[in-house]
A protein has these predicted regions:
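Extracellular zinc-dependent metalloprotease catalytic-domain scaffold
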Residues: 1-88, 93-225
Length: 228
């Protein structure tokens, strides 16, 4: 097999989550710029209720919240186990998303403008999803990155559209409104309704991965895809 990601797991309780996540990841990603990824996955019963999973990009390890094993969410309008969706999110972090790749495609507090992604394909597909959902893209030049919620979320996820008090925050860059898909899988929080969009694949392409935009697991529209 030519799968880009494989998972080492000795706990039969998470076998379903692993198989689901691998099916989706390896359907979307067809080539890696430098290596294959062998990832170890564990359950952790000590995680607080507001933490669903944690990934180490240094050791290629992922910990999932054992207390969330029975929970369900939707991904692309289809029911999935919550931890399957969390595992996909954490695998994407290990692949470099977002800003963990060393390519310098995220502008932080020191950038002008601040907290944006500047990679070609990520921006291109952000604009395409905006256009497909009826937004004007004439003056869109960046992809907003999360600017709230502190270490672990700040600047390592797509913009959620919320401020640090969980109030709606519309992003304006150079006085231009930048609508954001608040439940894209690489925002900072897994929601009841989640979507894998071409934005995620565009960023991976910027990182050198070969991706399949026609994958059945990628969508630009959704019944509950929300823009803020």
């Amino acid at each position: 097999m030519n799968d880009i990601v494989s998972i080492i797991n000795n706990d039969p309780r998470i076998e379903l989550y692993v198989l689901t996540a691998l099916r989706i990841i390896n359907n979307m990603i067809k080539g890696s710029p430098n290596k294959k990824y062998d990832i170890k996955v564990y359950l952790d019963s000590s995680m607080s209720d507001d933490i669903l999973g944690v990934a180490s990009v240094y050791t290629n390890e992922i910990w999932l919240n054992e207390n969330k094993m029975a929970d369900l969410v939707l991904l692309n309008d289809v029911d999935y186990n919550l931890l399957s969706v969390v595992l996909i999110h954490e695998i994407l972090h290990i692949l470099g998303m977002i800003g963990m790749d060393g390519f310098g495609l995220v502008q932080g507090e020191e950038g002008i403008p601040q907290n944006v992604y500047i990679g070609k394909h990520g921006i291109e597909h952000y604009k395409s999803i905006l256009s497909e959902n009826g937004f004007d893209i004439a003056n869109i030049h960046y992809l907003p990155i999360e600017n709230n919620f502190g270490e672990g979320t700040h600047r390592t996820h797509l913009e959620e559209g919320l401020d640090g008090n969980n109030e709606i925050e519309k992003r304006y860059i150079d006085d231009v409104y930048y609508p954001v898909p608040t439940n894209e899988i690489m925002t900072g929080f897994i929601n009841k309704y989640n979507y894998i969009t071409p934005i995620t694949l565009g960023i991976l392409e910027d990182y050198g991965f070969k991706v399949d935009y026609d994958s059945i697991y990628v969508t630009s529209v959704g019944k509950r895809l929300i823009f803020i």
